């Protein structure tokens, strides 16, 4: 059964792993990048960084392994590998249905850690770009998830107060960003939605 969203004026969707199942393609791209630049690859750790732009993930790799990789060079290689993927991921049914059910009555936005060009191309390739009233990417903000900037800008662009918005996310970083923005959040899991109201934030994070 789908959740009800009467209390909200705006619905904000993360993209990778929430609306579109891109994680396998991202994992494969990072594996090739790790092989190319010679660092250990841990898919579970990578998933914990979901929502973080590629160049910042490289900084985390440097910090974790004591390396001095060039974030621009390495993230550029990774993004090229992802762009060359034949299958980037299909729409995730439960969140896609929420989008379809609510886009005529609510304001809907994307709030993603992906760069603008890649995000726009992916959304267009899946036929959903034009459904959104706003698309906020890593290109438009300086402070990325878990900071609230992505979701606050999305709320501003759809002309809703943060308290009027609910976020759909699949990672802890995204949940933290939603709560930092003063927004309720639905986590997308393999078994469905898990509601995480902002009132729980102080006790769980």
Where do the protein language model's features map onto the residues?
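Helix-loop "lid/cap" segments that line or gate small-molecule binding pockets
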Residues: 33-34, 53-67, 122, 155
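Metal-dependent phosphoesterase signature
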Residues: 60-100
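Active-site neighborhood of HAD-like aspartate-dependent phosphohydrolases
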Residues: 2-47, 180-181, 191, 195
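Short beta->alpha linker loops
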Residues: 25, 49-53, 77, 90-94, ...
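Alpha-helical elements of Rossmann-like donor-binding domains used by nucleotide-donor carbohydrate transfer enzymes
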Residues: 28-32, 56, 60, 77, ...
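Asp-based, Mg2+/Mn2+-dependent phosphohydrolase catalytic module
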Residues: 1-9, 97-100, 106-107, 115-205
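Short helix-capping segments at alpha-helix termini
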Residues: 36-39, 65-69, 127-131, 159-160
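Structured helix-beta-strand junction loops
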Residues: 52, 104-105
């Amino acid at each position: 059964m789908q959740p009800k969203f009467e209390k909200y004026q705006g619905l904000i969707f993360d993209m990778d792993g929430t609306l579109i199942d891109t994680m396998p393609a991202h994992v494969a791209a990072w594996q090739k990048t790790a092989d190319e630049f010679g660092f250990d690859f841990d898919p579970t750790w990578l998933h914990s960084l979901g929502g973080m732009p590629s160049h910042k993930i490289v900084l985390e790799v440097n910090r974790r392994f004591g390396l001095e990789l060039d974030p621009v060079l390495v993230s550029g290689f990774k993004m090229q590998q992802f762009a060359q993927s034949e299958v980037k991921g299909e729409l995730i049914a439960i969140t896609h249905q929420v989008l379809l059910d609510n886009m005529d009555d609510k304001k809907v936005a994307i709030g993603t850690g992906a760069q603008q060009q890649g995000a726009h191309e992916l959304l267009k390739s899946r036929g959903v770009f034009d459904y959104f009233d706003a698309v906020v990417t890593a290109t438009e903000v300086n402070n990325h998830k878990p900071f609230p900037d992505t979701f606050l800008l999305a709320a501003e662009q759809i002309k809703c107060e943060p308290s009027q918005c609910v976020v759909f996310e699949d990672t802890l970083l995204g949940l933290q960003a939603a709560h930092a923005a003063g927004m309720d959040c639905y986590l997308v899991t393999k078994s469905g939605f898990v509601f995480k109201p902002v009132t729980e934030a102080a006790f769980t994070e």
